[in-house]
């Protein structure tokens, strides 16, 4: 598919000007004034600002939460449609490892949730709920084979997403060795649970 956007206002770090933008197979291939190219679709962007789509790096679609059957309200269809209406063209969601199971099982589940439903592009971080020493090689494989280079760990929500200090240390050490990224949900979940129960 090819797209020609005519007469749009383009703002860069150093310029502010009007031009045409030619897109082939979802890649911008030409920017210039009065482009003369054949395109399957043409959009007149006169008096309009042309900006790239936004990226939402933190979504939770169909996230199960706890034993009561609570699930976040948006699925991949409603969530990505809403994102597209707001100008977001990529989301990054969080497959959630079940305790005692492989991160690859979580990834497969999340791909199935997204399959055929997404209105926009998506990628993944990985929520880790436990990680024994023997499964640490999964982290390198996630990065190399699946492009997942960021992991989220929770210090909150005991019995749901909370990771113990051993898991926290093992995953942080491995991430440091391989140059991947850790996202922390940093609260004292044990103390919060005590306060809520008192």
Segments predicted by a language model, with ranges:
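Metal-associated gating/positioning segment near the N- to mid-region
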Residues: 45-117
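Histidine-rich, glycine-flanked metal-binding segment
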Residues: 1-4, 9-53, 67
